[in-house]
Amino acid sequence: MEEELVVISKSIVNPRSLKKPTSVKKIQLTPWDLSRLRFGYLQRGLLFHKIEVKQLQASLSVALDRFYPLAGRLVKLKNDDDTVSFFISCDGSGVEFVHAVAKNIELSDVLELSGSVPGFFASFFPATGIKNYHGVSRSLLMVQVTEMKDGVFIGFGYNSTVADATSIWKFINAWSEICSKDSSGSQTFQRRLHLKGWFFDEIDYPIHIPDPETKPTSYVTTPTNLQEKMFHVTKENVLKLDAKANDEADQKISSIQAVLAYIWRSMVKHSGMSREEETHCRLPINMRQRLNPPLEEECFGNVSQTGIATVTVGELLDHGLGWAAMQINNMELSQTDEKAKAFAENWVKNIKIPVSVGSKDLVVTNSHRFDVYCNDFGWGKPIAARAGPPYLNGRLVVFKGIGEASLDFQACLLPQVVEKLVKDAEFNEYVSIV
C-alpha cells in the first residue's frame, strides 16, 4: 500500500509573529537531552473523519508563536578539544508540513492495524529515519496530514531534545484549541511559556561531547521481522488486575503499574530468554515535580528521565503479579532529585550516547495521563491515537482508551511472541488483542 500514498505538497510553517523577537534566543541542552541525540524522532498521530488542511496550517502558525522552541533548530558548535556542543536556537526557522493523499486506504485499515512493520502505515509519518542530531538542518517538529478514502490522519514527529511527551501533547492540545475556537487571544495562550531552564548546578554548559554523527563504537541489533498489535484493556479488567496486584503486594500499586507488570511478565514468558538473563522495564518519568526545587508543571522542554526496573527472567516468572508491580513501583519511587543530578554528573564524566536500547526490554513510552481524545481541531474528536516508527522489539506505546478508564497499548514484538500471546488463554482473560 505504501506506493499508494502521494505527496501533494511540502512547505514550511513559520510562527505567525516571525519578525517579533522571542524572549529566549538560546536553550542549552542537558545530559538528558544530549544522551538522546542518536535516537530517532518520536512519532505519534491522530485519526479523524475530517480535517481542513489550510485551517490546520494557519492555526499551527499561531500555536508556534507560543511554543516557539518547536520552530527552532539545533546548532552544533565545534570545540578546540575535538568535541562538539549543541544548543537550540529559537530562530523561527519553522516546521516542515507535508500534505499527502492515500485514497485507497480506509479508516478500518488504520483501526485494524496489525501485522508486519514497517508496512504502509510508516509512510503516514513525516520523520521516519530522522535522528535527533539531524535537528541542525531538519525542523524539530514535523507534521504530515494524510487524506484517506474516508478519513484523515495527522502524524507528527518531534525531536526529543526539545520536548518530552508531556510538552508535545500540551502543544497539540493548544494547537487543536486554537484551530477549533480561534483562542489565540485567550488568557491561557497569552501567558509566557515556562522553559525548563538549567537545574544542574554542578555542571557547566555548554557540555562538550563526542560528535554523535561519528560512527558509534557499538550497536544494539534490532530485529527486522517485527509485528505490531493493539492491546486493549477494559476498565473492568484494569480494576481486576489492580486488585490482584495489590492483594499480592505489601505496598500501594497503581492501576497502570499492575497492567504494565502483567504485560511484562506475559511477554517475557514467551520470549524464549533463559532464566539467568536480565530483563528490564523502561519507563519515562516526568521529573518536573520531583526536582528540588520543583519546576512548574506546565514548563516546556524535555524533563523526562528513563527509569529502569531490572530483574532476571527467573525472578519475574517465579514471583507473582504483585511482586512484578512492586519492582516497577520501587523504581518509580527511586526517581528523586538526588538520583537525577547524580546521573547527570556521572554522565558528563563518562559520556555515552546510545543508538538504541536493549532489544530484550519492555520499553514503555507515552502515558495514559495524556488526554489524546480531547484534541478536537474543529471537526470532531479523534477516532484513534497511534504511534509510528522507529520500531523496536518490546516497545509498548501507552494510550488512554476511548472507553472510560480503559487502556490501549500499541505493542511491537517478535512474531513468535505475538503468536504465543494470541494463544495464551491467561493473557487473553484480561487483554484483548486486535
UniProtKB/Swiss-Prot annotation:
Organism domain of life: Eukaryota
Active site feature: D376
Keyword terms of this UniProt record: Acyltransferase, Plant defense, Transferase
Signal sequence range: none
EC number: 2.3.1.-
Induction (free text): By pathogenic bacteria (e.g. P.syringae) and jasmonic acid (MeJA).
Mutant phenotype after disruption: Hypersusceptiblity to both virulent and avirulent strains of the bacterial pathogen P.syringae associated with impaired pathogen-mediated induction of salicylic acid (SA) and reduced pathogenesis-related (PR) genes induction. These phenotypes are reversed by SA treatment. In the cv. No-0 but not the cv. Columbia background, defects in SA accumulation or signaling enhances resistance to necrotrophic pathogens such as the fungi B.cinerea and A.brassicicola, leading to small necrotic spots and minor chlorosis, as well as reduced fungal growth.
One protein family per Pfam: Transferase
Molecular function via GO: acyltransferase activity
GO biological process: defense response; regulation of defense response to bacterium; regulation of defense response to fungus; response to bacterium; response to jasmonic acid; salicylic acid biosynthetic process
Family label: Belongs to the plant acyltransferase family.
Entry function: Required for pathogen-induced salicylic acid (SA) accumulation and SA-mediated resistance to virulent and avirulent pathogens (e.g. P.syringae).
Name of this protein: Protein ENHANCED PSEUDOMONAS SUSCEPTIBILITY 1
Gene: EPS1
